[in-house]
């Protein structure tokens, strides 16, 4: 399997052969401060730098906010590396959107003036009025960017995003099955956080759910997708499943979720909860000569920063899986080693 639909069918990927734009929405939630909830950073202090560093890597092929690249505590590299290779090979334009960052990136970006998300284990995530304002601003961004392309590809980077995604799914009355950046998904810890968080949800109205248990990146992605006048590829895993369920309750969007096979084969995740078709791509990292890349096949990291979506687009544009892996390894050698 290099590319296959795991739910439904869609022509959106075909559109990516024409004019496409990649939009990376980045932000932070203080939920990432809960010990053991995420490994999206080499240590707790560095977690807040992961989203801006991911965005910098996509533009420059190196990070400016931190030394090296975002990695797990034992050195497994950010999925931004895969997205970087795909963007380089396809020449698709990149736009970065700040939706609630703690640390702004050292690159040009669009700012939605979104709040940082609060720790959903302790309080409501965001002020409802703020969420509504950010959503409207994001719709404007989506509308304008969609004029440049036949399809908008939207990715995300937010540590602890799978935890807020689980809370959103639960608050919407769905099974809170989400993936993790670790092979041993801290399911029990997430479940406790989610149970505590959903007690604050007053209704299953999507804006209320977002405000109570979501995160600012969800607001940005949902708004951009809702504002787009063209079809959308939601480039991500279970976080995009949660966002897709919010979007489907807020308006009409022609969308498909594109993720990696590592999420699709994760027993703790449930992509069938998506209201839109889902396609999974295999970046072939299991065949890599580098342990840091093979780790993806072993259940580490899995997805993020639009990696699965951009791999799918690269394949749709005729880049062979063998060539793609070769180029990812070249970038890994230059950027990581």
UniProtKB/Swiss-Prot annotation:
Signal peptide: none annotated. It holds the Pfam family DBI_PRT. GO terms for molecular function: nicotinate-nucleotide-dimethylbenzimidazole phosphoribosyltransferase activity. InterPro entries: Nict_dMeBzImd_PRibTrfase, Nict_dMeBzImd_PRibTrfase_arc, Nict_dMeBzImd_PRibTrfase_sf. Belongs to the UPF0284 family. NCBIfam families: nicotinate mononucleotide-dependent phosphoribosyltransferase CobT, PRK04447.1-5. This is UPF0284 protein AF_0276. It comes from Archaeoglobus fulgidus (strain ATCC 49558 / DSM 4304 / JCM 9628 / NBRC 100126 / VC-16).
């Amino acid at each position: 399997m290099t590319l296959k639909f795991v739910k439904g069918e869609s022509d959106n990927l075909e559109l990516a052969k024409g004019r496409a734009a990649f939009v990376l929405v980045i932000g932070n939630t203080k939920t990432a401060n809960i010990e053991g909830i995420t490994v999206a950073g080499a240590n707790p202090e560095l977690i807040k730098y992961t989203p801006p560093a991911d965005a910098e890597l996509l533009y420059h092929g190196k990070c400016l906010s931190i030394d090296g690249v975002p990695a797990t505590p034992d050195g497994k590299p950010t999925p931004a590396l895969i997205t970087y290779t795909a963007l380089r090979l396809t020449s698709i334009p990149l736009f970065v959107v700040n939706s609630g960052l703690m640390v702004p990136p050292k690159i040009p970006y669009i700012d939605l003036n979104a709040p940082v998300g609060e720790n959903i284990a302790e309080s409501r995530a965001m002020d409802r009025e703020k969420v509504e304002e950010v959503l409207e601003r994001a719709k404007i961004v989506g509308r304008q960017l969609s004029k440049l392309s036949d399809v908008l590809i939207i990715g995300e980077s937010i540590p602890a995003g799978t935890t807020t995604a689980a809370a959103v799914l639960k608050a919407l009355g769905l099974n809170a099955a989400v993936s993790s950046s670790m092979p041993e998904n801290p399911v029990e810890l997430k479940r406790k956080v989610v149970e505590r968080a959903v007690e604050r949800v007053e209704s299953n109205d999507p804006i209320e759910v977002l405000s109570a248990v979501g995160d600012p990146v969800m607001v940005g992605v949902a708004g951009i997708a809702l504002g787009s006048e063209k079809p959308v590829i939601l480039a991500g895993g279970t976080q995009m499943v949660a966002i897709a369920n919010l979007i489907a309750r807020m308006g009409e969007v022609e969308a498909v979720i594109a993720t990696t096979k590592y999420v699709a084969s994760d027993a703790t995740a449930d992509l069938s909860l998506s209201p839109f078709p889902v396609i999974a791509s295999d970046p072939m990292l299991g065949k890599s000569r580098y342990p840091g890349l093979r780790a993806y096949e072993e259940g580490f990291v899995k997805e993020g920063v639009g990696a699965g979506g951009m791999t799918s687009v690269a394949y749709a544009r005729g880049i062979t899986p063998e060539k793609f892996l070769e180029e990812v390894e070249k970038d890994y050698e230059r950027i990581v080693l």
